[in-house]
Amino acid sequence: MKYDFIVVGSGAIAGSIAYELASRNLSVCRVGSTDRTNAASKAAGAMNGCFGEITSGLLASEHGKLKLNMDCISKALWPAWAQRLADSSGDTRALFTAKGTHVILNTAGMEEIDSVNYDAIEQTLNEYAAPYETVDPREIEWLKPNDLVRPLRALYIPDEHALDSHLLLEKLDAALVAEGGVLKDENVKSVLIEDGLAIGVELLSGERLMADKVVVAAGAHSLDLLSNIPSVVRQIPPIFAGYGVSILVKMPKGRELPTSVIRTPNRAFACGLHCVPRGDGVLYLGATNILAEKPRSQALISDVQFLLGCALDQLDINLHDADILSIQVGNRPIPADGFPLIGECGVNGLWLATGTYRDGLHQSPLLADYVANALTGIENTQINLDSFNPVRPPLVGFSREVMAKETVQQMLATGYEYRWDIKPYWLPLLNEGMTRNYQDLIESLHPQFTPPPELVAFSYIYESMRERLRSYYEAWS
């Protein structure tokens, strides 16, 4: 059988695109292992983060503001999307597990990162006339941090909820099949290209599936499936794995869960410390973010220790008697310039929908509609994502002049969250040394193109990252 569309991947984006296409009475086969080992979606806290995700860096460029607009549109789509999934799947279990989001500004971070990002969140809420209220952090129920890192300010965003990512993926599977789609529980080896046209995929088993068009939404693994078109892949921002750890814990009997998301602003290259109630006494704790040379399948002891320490310190000192149910590992897809890869990619009939970093699950309803419209010739009137076409030179977030400084600040923020204790006169020495090292690295990569701060920091460690960046930059020089 030849399908209208093959969608490669089993995360929230792939599942949503496949479901949307099937619901339009098109023949669709979604290909990807449904155990979703190490997928970002499965390990996600699944916050409907929009304003809570804002950083000063996001607002520093028009491309960053476009990502914010994607988040805002997506947030408005979720109630109807959740109802559609319930209707199609027949699964009426409540998808949302948290009501609203508390953003806390505590003393575990540093002024140049935490305070600046907290102010950016509040300023943008005001600019968008979005609902929120300032609250006394002492009045946030459930929150019982160590006094040394207690929050000094807090705000509540009433319409930024969170959902159960595991249940979402189950509903997407069931909804696809109910709408007539085919679910192939096997991973893809490569996309098949013939005479400059995508014609299908080859599975790891050797089986071949054919389609008029192929959408690759396989997260951090997406570009690995295009190895037979190296001249095209070389012009696409390479995707790096943002390895992250999250933990599910079971609270002791009689102990209540928070009713909202509780989170800090984004800091130290990560998405901020956060907890999300999952119901039935289960609490989600997240999340770390370490750029790795390749996707990881197991959590490091150091990252588990760090996350648990932060949760005990900054959220609830009584968490020590909770049971650990699961240590989850996910790999976020992080493009070389930090911006999504959405659109046809140099081969007729071949589309990419990945590179969304930590926003993919939240943006999945929007991306499903956007990609389905584009694939079927329907004009997208809500938003234009042409600038995120995968075949592109690097997009600019932070200016090159401040990149080394921003990288140093994020690295120092990591130290503060570890509760380091160093002599004050060491700070200027560390600052000067790291700034010089990072600036030298930036200059050595390319005279014009500059990676975002997290890639500056981790490519300084890994030669393989530097090689991939240089190869991509050379393609556009």
Model-identified regions with their sequence ranges:
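Helix-rich C-terminal "cap"/substrate-channel and partner-interaction subdomain
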Residues: 374-477
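C-terminal catalytic lobe of FAD-dependent flavoproteins
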Residues: 316-418
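N-terminal Rossmann-like FAD-binding beta1-loop-alpha1 element of flavoenzymes
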Residues: 3-30
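Helical element adjacent to the flavin cofactor pocket in flavoenzyme catalytic cores
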Residues: 155-204, 209, 213
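Helix-loop-beta segment of a Rossmann-like dinucleotide-binding subdomain
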Residues: 92-110, 121, 134-179, 288-292, ...
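Short hydrophobic core segments
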Residues: 6-8, 209-222, 368
